[in-house]
Amino acid sequence: MLQARQEEKQQGSKTKKNKKNWKRIVPIAAAACVCVIVGATVGIKQINKGNNKTLDAATIASAADQKETTQTLITAKDYKEIKKCIKEYNKQMARDNNSMAIGMYESASSSDATSAESSNVSDTGAYSDTNLRENGVGEADIVKTDGKNIYTLCRSVVTITAIDNGSMEKLASIEQDAERYVEDIYVQDDKLVLFGTLGRQVGNSEDSEAYDGYYENNTYVQVYDISDPSNPKEIGNMEQSGGYNTSRIVDGYVYVLSQFHPYEDNVTARDLWYIPEVQGKSIEAENIYMPQEAEGNEYTIITAFSLDNPSEKTDSKAVFGYSDVCYVSENNIYITSNYYEDSDVSRTLIRKISYTDGKLVGVAQTKIKGMLNDSFSIDEYEGNLRLVTTIDEIYSNDDIMPLNETADKTEKAVAENVKDAVPGTNSLYVLNDKLEIIGSIHNLAKDETIYSARFMGDTGYFVTYRQVDPLFSVDLSDPENPKILGELKIPGFSEYLHPYGDGKLLGIGMDVSEDGFTTEGVKLSMFNVTDPSNVTEENKYTIEESYGTDVGYNYKGVFVDVQKNLFGFVTYHDGVTYQLYTYDEAEGFKEVMSRQLSGYEGSRGLYIGDVFYLVSGNMIESYSMNGFEKMDDIVL
């Protein structure tokens, strides 16, 4: 059943948390902080030198072959080509047990993973919304409100609670069978949307080589009519192959991403076991994009449908390759993954899929040197894509492979833009709408790692860290000639950056001693960015006795309302505490509410009218925003 999977997801979340929550003495220089905000099923990430050379050249191009071909998004000719690709890759992995390939598939929670350009305020201003990564792009979460009710998700049970100026009453709940695990919910226009993973056992010990067979995960979506919130009614559903990754909602259309790892077995004997399905039907070959590199055994699947007709897909695409960091702008979906070539240099593969009114179109794909920290390290603005990466391993001269170009032009771009990049540094790239490099800066912050980033219009900010926290500011007004404007060095580091009104940038991270070895607690920083060339730390505040927070990998857990001058999040002390702060330029940070929680099951803060609601697991508490005195509570 799905119990094992749920425990694995919870354990994975704890593992992430431990990486972030240092206590007392920590060897900072050895810390490698990589925050991934999307839940993903991780497939083959790495290969040893020369491994891909033994693959069928007509099926998967080697690194050398890639230099001689353009890298447009190419669809499969037919199912035979896809099957051959998967079988060749699986044979290669079986032949080389000493390969650097990592895992078959390990699940990561879609706390979704990671990040927010916008404030989480509704259009009316009467209630708050989830902290979003991109303005205008809706995201599902574990808590939602429509201003009249609060919708909560806890242990796969969705509960609808009516609110009335701080008073609360449970109206209804939606429960699932043991094989279904709900991971996200969304509310819009009297519709409640549930996203989750359905696990089915395939085979048993009598007719399968595997003991008790194996579990096949499918992503499922259920849409309910909540015009009568006390009696929600299911009006449609969608199902697709693979475990749930993430989702977005734009202009009434839902876009669902899942990770599918085909498994050939002798039980089901399904002829097209290697082809993903949507609503029980195989995705057509012309809608399946072939591997960009030697990643021929896993898919990222995208399905679109309208909330008005949730059982009928409007489009679907399958892209070979897993999704490490997924970023969705107002017009495009960017699927990225880490990749290690023959040279053992880390790279990021990028695939671009445009979307509009439920239709999906493959645009381009490329690769850049280095790895993304999270979805804030990648941002689309005025048709260009800006990224900051950390360069690992040794240098290779085939850094960028722009799309739709000849090998000669590609190599010229590499020579002009990447030749000075060295390992152990960081880079900034600007790519055009075809994912061709048009601007770059290299060799930033030697021996440091990017911990957070925020792009704000024509200016970008990013934090690197080893022993001190340099906050870099970058002028991006000329995309072809980005320039470093300034560099502020202070102890500690910021894991999360958020715009906080005109000329202000909020940072949340850790305060660390100047020697870089002793943590002092969770640190709040307010940066004055009025002059990007002369950024200053206007005020700072250390939460004593705290040793961590999850804001670096779970941006949805951060409540920020600039107009109300409030922000809150969970910190870890001897227990778990939700803390709410306000800010004044003269007086600095001030704690206005602190509530110790009984455990960590996902906590969110939100407001409706003049009441602040704190949700933790199956508990909701209400507080007056005039003094933050408790008004009511309910256990669901």
Regions found by a protein language model. Give the residues of each.
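Single-pass transmembrane signal-anchor helices and their membrane-water interface zones
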Residues: M1-Q6, V26-K53
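Disordered, charged N-terminal biogenesis/targeting segments of membrane/secreted proteins
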Residues: M1-K20
